[in-house]
Amino acid sequence: MGQKVNSNGLRFGINKNWISRWTANSHAQTAKWLIEDEKIRNLFFVNYRNAQVSNVEIERTQATVDVFVYAAQPAFLIGSENKNIQKITKQIKQIIGRTTNLDLTINEIGSPMLSARIIARDLANAIEARVPLRTAMRQSLIKVLKAGANGIKVLVSGRLNGAEIARDKMYIEGNMPLSTLRADIDYALEKAQTTYGVIGVKVWINRGMIYTKGLNRTPAHILHPQKKQPNRQNQQPRHFNQGQVLSANKLTGSDVETSSIQALTKPNKEDKQ
């Protein structure tokens, strides 16, 4: 089951909070608000790609709308003297209606490389820039694992490298328990527009297990920022066998010498013949 369904949708209400939180009064209002939420998310994901937006959460009442944006580069959303925020606020009010009270909150992500959407978008940009597919996928794997992820799965499908027949290519590194509901797995789908057609990019990132009760208000990569890697430039190089003890044989130096001498003095069967 976990291999087939959307990994985010499978965990909503269990260890992930819903990205749209509201209650409508009628079916018509439900359809209207769903379309508006999709337009608001596309506004950030398409028009503000430089900000590297990871997630957009929306809370509504009948009179207010609260939008929470999680981005790796919030400066592109804020702008100088909050000019971009004013522009974004006007664009959102054109979608939801000017009479609705809007509250826009922008949060910075601590570890962008643990966001599946950011990794998928970077990989799609590399494909559009005609970077070799294997190189781009390998670089994405290395970035995520260095950031502290427990595992990553990348699937790219379409006319890869301009091939006549569409195919898919997949890389998996580390643990990827898609059927374990307590696993904090982030999933995202992005599209790369190439001259040969559309190439789909899917990314799954395993950020560890969640054992606490309740839903997280913010994603795990915001609660647990990226750890600094230790500086190993000034350390002495260590040889492969340094510090290892032969505990299985428990041989001292004299025992090794006597055993080697006995092996040399022992006659062979061929010499007897």
From Swiss-Prot:
GO terms for molecular function: mRNA binding; rRNA binding; structural constituent of ribosome. GO terms for biological process: translation. Signal peptide: none annotated. GO terms for cellular component: cytosolic small ribosomal subunit. It comes from the Bacteria. Residues 244-265 have a biased composition (Polar residues). Residues 244-273 are annotated as: Disordered. InterPro entries: KH_dom, KH_dom-like_a/b, KH_dom_type_2, KH_sf_prok-type, Ribosomal_S3_C_sf, Ribosomal_uS3_bac-typ, Ribosomal_uS3_C, Ribosomal_uS3_CS. Residues 40-110 form the KH type-2 domain. Belongs to the universal ribosomal protein uS3 family. This is Small ribosomal subunit protein uS3.
